[in-house]
Every structure is written in structure tokens, then in C-alpha cells.
């Protein structure tokens, strides 16, 4: 009987204890619901003005970290266990994550996303206000470091691919130039410089037999300093030359047998033809007429130079007579038709050789008589000179 009474007393005591604990649990839940009335400050407020803890508490005071309490509610069926979040102190709120990090005037701030609040309620909190959440800050810093390493790897990979693209473009560029249209290249040849026209040497004259003439000119004759006695005589010679060419109807021969109006090409009219202009471009068709006019003037200058430096100049310097007639004949040597008779004879030694100069009176086609020497006839009318020698040659046998 005693044992039965003891068991019943134990059951009654346990039931009374369970009823009291249930009453305490319900009172605690109601009190928790009534006490949660704190809210975080607005997002636009400055980070420096946000309080770390509630009024009356120190800045370094941490929130109360109460262990999770497992409470059992007993109903019709079996008891169900529920986890209830611990109560936070006044002024403390739960952090969901860290969004960004910045440094202002040497102080580090973090953009905090609060749990249960929208993104517009995010605030920048200084590092001192987050001293109780060092684990969240450390995790965020590690994620930043890992993110920087990933970005660097991506940058290195991108820099390795870009040079290959540039190299391909560089190699492909010359190929495009080779496939371009053909380009015409014009090679411009500069005219060969002609020798000075005012330098005359009688040693450059060669007769028909290939022997050099022995006459020499000791001076260099300029274009304006011809070795003539009077300017009036020169003008007279030019006028007579024009009259002779107009009456005979013979065109001026520039490239015929190396002669120019009966004279050898001392300076050569070909130099005027080759040296068309100082430039390198070709002349147009309109400039050819000007070139022809220059050739005629060049022939005139050439005849004047030949008068000053030719073999007749030596004969004129020797003091022979009628030098005007010789000059007239020298300008048109092909018009001589007959040798009348010899006038003078002169022998000289040159290079240990005997040089004989014979002066003849010749008749031109227009009937005028002129004086010519044998050297001039050898170059221009060799057949006429040979016929004269054959007709007038006399053989005297030696005794």
C-alpha cells in the first residue's frame, strides 16, 4: 500500500510540474512578442552618426548572445520541438550579408544588408560598429581577395589572346597590298650634259682620208667674242647667207655626212637636239616648233664658231685678201662648181711633217668668185680638187 501511494504522489508532482512549465513557456512567448519594437535607422543617415549600442551602454558592449532555447508545446498529440531565435538587445539588428567596402579619409566602411529589410535600407557602417561580427567581415575580405585573383587571371588570359590577333592582322596586311591594282611606273631619263659650245679646237677636225688637220686655235672663243674684225662685216655675212639659201632653195642640212652648211660639225648641231631642255620631262608637241627654231639659230651660231675656229680662220689670220668672200663661201660650201686657178702657196712643218696649204679661186653656182683652200676642198669637195690636180698636173722627168 505504501508503494502505491508513493507512485501516485510522484505522478501528481510530475503533472503539477509540467503544468507550471507550460504556463511559463506561454508567458515567455507573449513577452517576447511584446518586447520586439526596435527598428534600424534610415539608409540616408551618415555612418558616423549611427549608434553602436543603445543609450546608457558602452560602445564596446556586445549584444547578448543567449543560447538557443528549445521549447516544447504539449497539445492533443505528441510534443513538437521548435527553435526560437534569441532576443537581441536594444539597438542591435541581425546582419544578412556585406555588399560593398570603401575607404573614406582612412576609415573603412562596409555596406550592410539587414535581414528582413529591403535593399533601400542598406547602410554604410564603420568597422568599429561591426566589431562583434568579425567572422562575417573576415569572410567578406577573403571573398574580395579571391575575386581579385580571378580578375587577374582573366586579364592575363585576355592579354595573351590579343597579341595573336594583332600578329594575324599584321601578317595579313601585306597580302592585301600584293593583291592591289598594278601601278604604272614612269622612268624619266635626264638629258646627257652637252660639252661647252664655246670651246673650239682645230685638232678635232678630220679630213676625208682620216688624217688630222694641223691647224690649231690657241684661244677659247666665246659666243660674243668672235675673232672677226668688224661687227658690220658679220651682219653683212649673215644677210648674204640668208640670200644664198633662199635663191638656191637648198634646205639646211643638220645631219648629213657630218657637215653643217659646208662646214664640219665643230660644236655640232646634234648637241642642240639632244639637249632639248634642262628638265627631265618630255616636251609636248607644241614645243617641237620652238625646238626647230632653236636648231636654225644653233646652225647660225655653229657657222660663226666654225668661222672663228675652222681652217679658214687660220688662213684669214695669215693676212690673205678678200676674207669676206671666203666667209661667204664657207657658209654654203656645196655651191662651189669650179676651181679657176691657184692663188697662193704656203708650206709649214707641224709635228715634223710638211704641211702644204694652197689657196684657190673658186666659182659658185650663183657666179660669185670666192677663195678656198685645199683643206676645205678635201673635206667638202674632194672630187673637184682631185679633178683639178689631174688636169693641171705636169710631170717633169729628172735629168
From Swiss-Prot:
Spans annotated as Disordered: 1-72
Stored SUPFAM superfamilies: Chromo domain-like
GO term, biological process aspect, one: heterochromatin formation
Compartments where located: Nucleus
CDD domains with a match to the protein in the record: CD_CSD, CSD
GO-annotated cellular components: heterochromatin; nucleus
Residue ranges constituting the Chromo domain according to the UniProt record: 93-152, 332-396
Quaternary structure and partners: Homodimer. Interacts with H3.
Protein name as annotated: Chromo domain protein LHP1
Organism: Solanum lycopersicum (Tomato)
Lineage of the organism: Eukaryota, Viridiplantae, Streptophyta, Embryophyta, Tracheophyta
Amino acid at each position: 500500500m505504501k508503494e502505491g501511494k508513493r507512485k501516485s504522489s510522484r505522478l501528481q508532482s510530475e503533472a503539477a510540474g509540467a503544468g507550471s512549465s507550460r504556463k511559463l513557456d506561454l508567458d515567455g512567448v507573449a513577452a517576447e512578442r511584446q518586447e520586439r519594437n526596435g527598428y534600424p535607422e534610415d539608409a540616408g543617415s551618415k555612418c558616423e552618426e549611427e549608434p553602436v549600442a543603445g543609450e546608457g551602454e558602452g560602445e564596446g558592449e556586445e549584444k547578448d548572445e543567449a543560447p538557443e532555447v528549445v521549447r516544447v508545446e504539449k497539445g492533443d498529440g505528441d510534443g513538437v520541438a521548435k527553435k526560437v531565435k534569441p532576443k537581441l538587445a536594444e539597438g542591435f539588428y541581425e546582419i544578412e550579408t556585406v555588399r560593398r567596402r570603401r575607404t573614406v579619409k582612412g576609415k573603412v566602411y562596409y555596406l550592410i544588408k539587414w535581414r528582413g529589410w529591403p535593399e533601400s535600407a542598406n547602410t554604410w557602417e564603420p568597422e568599429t560598429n561591426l566589431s562583434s561580427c568579425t567572422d562575417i567581415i573576415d569572410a567578406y575580405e577573403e571573398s574580395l581577395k579571391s575575386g581579385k585573383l580571378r580578375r587577374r587571371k582573366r586579364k592575363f588570359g585576355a592579354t595573351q589572346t590579343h597579341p595573336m590577333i594583332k600578329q594575324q592582322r599584321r601578317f595579313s596586311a601585306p597580302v592585301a597590298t600584293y593583291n592591289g591594282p598594278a601601278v604604272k611606273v614612269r622612268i624619266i631619263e635626264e638629258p646627257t650634259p652637252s660639252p661647252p659650245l664655246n670651246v673650239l679646237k682645230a685638232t678635232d677636225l678630220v679630213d676625208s682620208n682620216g688624217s688630222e688637220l694641223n691647224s690649231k686655235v690657241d684661244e677659247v672663243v666665246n659666243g660674243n667674242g668672235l675673232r672677226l674684225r668688224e661687227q658690220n662685216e658679220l651682219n653683212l655675212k649673215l644677210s648674204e647667207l640668208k640670200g644664198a639659201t633662199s635663191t638656191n632653195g637648198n634646205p639646211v642640212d643638220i645631219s648629213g655626212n657630218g657637215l653643217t652648211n659646208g662646214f664640219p660639225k665643230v660644236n655640232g648641231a646634234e648637241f642642240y637636239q639632244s639637249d632639248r631642255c634642262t628638265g627631265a620631262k618630255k616636251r609636248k608637241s607644241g614645243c617641237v616648233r620652238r625646238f626647230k627654231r632653236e636648231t636654225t639659230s644653233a646652225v647660225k651660231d655653229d657657222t660663226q664658231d666654225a668661222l672663228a675656229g675652222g681652217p679658214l680662220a687660220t688662213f684669214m689670220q695669215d693676212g690673205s685678201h678678200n676674207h669676206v668672200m671666203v666667209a661667204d663661201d664657207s657658209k654654203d660650201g656645196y655651191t662651189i662648181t669650179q676651181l679657176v686657178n691657184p692663188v697662193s702657196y704656203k708650206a709649214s712643218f707641224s709635228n715634223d711633217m710638211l704641211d702644204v696649204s694652197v689657196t684657190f679661186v673658186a666659182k659658185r653656182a650663183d657666179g660669185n668668185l670666192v677663195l678656198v683652200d685645199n683643206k676645205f676642198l678635201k673635206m667638202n669637195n674632194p672630187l673637184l680638187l682631185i679633178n683639178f690636180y689631174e688636169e693641171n698636173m705636169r710631170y717633169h722627168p729628172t735629168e
